[in-house]
A protein has these predicted regions:
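NTP/phosphate- and nucleic-acid-binding module
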Residues: 1-575
C-alpha cells in the first residue's frame, strides 16, 4: 500500500513555466515526473508505477503473441551502424562518444543492427525461422527542439521488436501478427487510435503504418476519409491529379510587377493589368531550399504552402533540409529574391522539383528572374523541366481522397506506435543469411515494430485528463483506489487505514492519504489532480455511519454504509 504520509510526492499548484501541453503540465504538477534537463526527465513513484503498468501490458501482449524478449546495451559500437550507413544518415540526431582509446560509440536511437547481428550469430537455417524478438529499452536522440514534456524527449523508452523470415510471404504474416498485437495493446491501454499509412524514413523498407492517438496538441498531422476509411500521415498523402488537357498557351511573356511582395498583391495586379480573373492557384511559388548543402527549388501552386516535412520525407536520401537564407542568395547572384522562376534554373545551378499539381503542359504566372518582373504563360515541359515530382504542398482539409475522391478531414495526433516492413536492407548490409531447403544461402527479410512506452504515459494523459487533473484508466493507474482520510479525529484515520488494508487484501491496489498536516480541501484537490480512478472519502459522514465513493472519470459520488464499505466498493468497481 502507498501511504501519502511517507510517499515521495509533492504536488504543485502552479503550472511549470515550460509546459506547452496538458500532459506535461499535469504530470509535473501531480508529482509524476521532474525535469532534469531539456528533454530528460526523472520518474517519481506515482509516475514510475504508471509507466511500469503500461510496460507490463505491452510485455504480456508481446509474450502472448509468441515474441521472445531480449535486452541490448544502450551504448553501441560505431561499426555496425557504418555498415548500414546510419552512422551518417542519422546526422546530428545521434549521440556520439569516444572511449579512452579513441574508439567511436553511440547511444542507441534504435537497435536494428544489434538485433540483426544477434540472429546472424545464433541461427543459420530456414528451420530457425520465423522468429520475432523484442526488447524494452531506453533510446537516445539529440532532438533539436525537445518539447511537450515526455512526448518528445532526448531520452525515452521504447518497445522495439523485429521479425525475421525466409521470404516476403513470411514477412507479411509476421507484420500482421504484430499489427494485431498492437491493436490489442492499445485497446487495453484505453487509447483511442487510428492506423494510418506512413513513410519509412531513415528506417528504410517498404510498407509502413503508424498508430496515432488523436490529440489537439499532437505533433503529427494525418488525413482521414470518413467515407472509405483511407487514413495516412500527411507525409504519405498522395496527390492525384489529372493530366493537362487545355490549349497550348502562347509563348511566355515578361511584365512589370513592382510592389508585389505577396501572392495576393500579384493576383490583384495581374487581374487589373490584363483584365483576367486569376487566383493564387494560377501562380507558381518557387520555394528555395538547401538540401544537404545543395540548392534546390520546389514548385507549388501559389495558394499552397510548402510542407517541409513532406518534402523531406519524399526526397530520398536527404538528411538536412532548410529554407534559403540571405547568405545563400549571396552565393547565387542570379537568383532575385521574390522574383524567382524555374525558367533558368539549370543555368543558375538549381535543381528543380515540382509538386504533382504542376502537371506537364500546365502554364503559370511566376517570377521572371528579374527584379520587379514576373512572367505569364510559363509552361511546364516547354519553358522549364523538373528533376522529379515530389509531394511538397501542404495538405488541406477538403482535398480529394486518393482512393475515392471524397473530401478528407485533417486531425492532429501523437504517434504511439510504428510498424515497418524493412525487407532485406539490414540483413543485406550485415550479411544475415540462412540456408534454404535446397542448401542455398538466402538473405533474411525483416520487419521492425516500435511502441513509445514512456510516450504512451503522456498520450493517455492527453486523451483522458480534464480541467482539474489526470484521469487514469484502471489498468494503468498507479493505484486503483485512493482512500482519503478527511478530518482530524483519530477514528477517521483508523477507519481509513483499516478500509485501505481490507481493499488491498481484496486484490485492489490502494493509495492512502493519511497525512495529518493537510486539510480536507488540499486532499480533495490532490486526489482530483493525481487521477486515481476511484476515490473513497472517509470524513465527517463517518459519524453517521457512511463513507463517500467517487468515480473520477464520471465525476459521480454516492454514499455507502461504512459497515458494508468493502463489499459495496468492490461491487461498484467490478460492476
Amino acid at each position: 500500500m502507498l501511504r501519502m504520509s511517507t510517499l515521495l510526492l509533492r504536488t504543485l499548484r502552479d503550472d511549470p513555466a515550460d509546459a506547452e501541453v496538458a500532459s506535461h503540465r499535469l504530470l509535473v504538477r501531480a508529482g509524476y515526473v521532474r525535469r532534469v534537463a531539456a528533454g530528460i526527465y526523472s520518474w517519481l513513484p506515482l509516475g514510475y508505477r504508471t509507466y511500469r503498468n503500461i510496460e507490463k501490458i505491452i510485455r504480456e501482449d508481446m509474450d502472448n503473441a509468441g515474441f521472445q524478449e531480449v535486452h541490448f546495451p544502450s551504448m553501441l559500437p560505431r561499426e555496425p551502424y557504418e555498415s548500414t550507413n546510419r552512422w551518417t544518415e542519422y546526422g546530428p540526431d545521434l549521440f556520439r562518444l569516444k572511449d579512452r582509446k579513441g574508439n567511436d560509440y553511440l547511444l542507441g536511437p534504435t537497435h536494428e543492427e544489434m538485433f540483426t547481428l544477434m540472429v546472424k550469430g545464433e541461427f543459420s537455417s530456414y528451420k530457425d525461422l520465423p522468429l520475432s524478438i523484442y526488447q524494452i529499452q531506453t533510446k537516445f536522440r539529440d532532438e533539436p527542439r525537445p518539447r511537450s514534456g515526455i512526448i518528445r524527449g532526448r531520452e525515452f523508452v521504447m518497445k522495439d521488436s523485429y521479425s525475421f523470415d525466409i521470404d516476403d510471404a513470411g514477412l507479411e504474416a509476421s507484420y500482421q501478427r504484430h499489427r494485431e498485437a498492437y491493436i490489442k495493446t492499445f485497446n487495453r491501454l484505453g487509447l483511442k487510435f487510428n492506423i494510418v499509412s506512413a513513410m519509412s524514413g531513415a528506417m528504410g523498407g517498404s510498407k509502413s503504418e503508424e498508430f496515432l492517438a488523436p490529440c489537439p496538441t499532437g505533433e503529427d498531422t494525418y488525413v482521414l476519409c470518413e467515407k472509405c476509411g483511407f487514413a495516412a500521415n500527411v507525409e504519405a498523402m498522395v496527390t492525384k491529379v489529372a493530366p493537362y488537357t487545355g490549349e497550348v498557351p502562347p509563348a511566355f511573356e515578361i511584365f512589370d510587377s513592382p510592389n508585389t511582395p505577396t501572392i495576393d498583391s500579384l493576383v490583384e495586379l495581374v487581374n487589373a493589368k490584363f483584365g483576367q480573373e486569376i487566383t493564387g492557384a494560377d501562380t507558381l511559388k518557387n520555394v528555395l531550399l538547401m538540401a544537404d548543402g545543395k540548392a534546390i527549388s520546389v514548385l507549388v501552386p501559389g495558394d499552397r504552402e510548402v510542407d517541409l516535412k513532406r518534402v523531406g520525407a519524399n526526397l530520398a536520401g536527404v538528411q538536412e533540409l532548410r529554407l534559403f537564407e540571405d547568405e545563400d542568395f549571396a552565393k547565387y547572384p542570379g537568383l532575385v529574391k521574390g522574383y524567382v522562376g524555374p525558367q533558368d534554373a539549370a543555368k543558375l545551378g538549381i535543381t528543380v522539383y515540382a509538386d504533382p499539381r504542376i502537371v506537364i503542359g500546365s502554364h503559370w504566372i511566376t517570377g521572371a528572374n528579374e527584379r520587379d518582373k514576373h512572367a505569364r504563360y510559363v509552361t511546364h515541359g516547354r519553358d522549364f523541366t523538373v528533376e522529379a515530382f515530389v509531394e511538397a504542398a501542404e495538405v488541406k482539409a477538403g482535398d480529394p481522397c486518393p482512393t475515392c475522391e471524397t473530401p478528407v478531414v485533417i486531425d492532429r495526433a501523437i504517434e504511439i506506435g510504428h510498424i515497418f516492413q524493412l525487407g532485406r536492407k539490414y540483413a543485406q548490409a550485415l550479411g544475415l543469411t540462412v540456408l534454404d531447403q535446397n542448401g542455398k544461402a538466402q538473405v533474411v527479410t525483416m520487419g521492425s515494430y516500435g511502441i513509445g512506452v514512456s510516450r504512451a504515459v503522456a498520450a493517455i494523459a492527453e486523451q483522458t485528463h480534464d480541467e482539474i487533473g489526470l484521469n487514469w484508466p484502471r489498468e494503468i493507474a498507479p493505484a486503483e483506489v485512493h482512500v482519503v482520510a478527511a478530518g482530524k479525529d483519530d477514528s477517521i484515520f483508523s477507519f481509513a487505514a483499516n478500509l485501505a488494508e481490507q481493499l488491498e487484501a481484496s486484490g485492489l491496489t490502494v493509495l492512502l492519504d493519511d497525512r495529518k498536516d493537510a486539510s480536507p480541501g488540499v486532499k480533495f484537490k490532490d486526489a482530483e489532480l493525481i487521477g486515481i480512478p476511484y476515490i473513497v472519502i472517509v470524513g465527517k459522514s463517518l459519524a453517521e455511519g457512511n463513507i463517500e465513493f467517487r468515480v473520477r472519470s464520471a465525476g459521480s459520488k454516492v454514499e455507502f454504509a461504512a459497515d458494508n464499505a468493502v463489499s459495496e466498493i468492490l461491487a461498484a468497481i467490478n460492476n
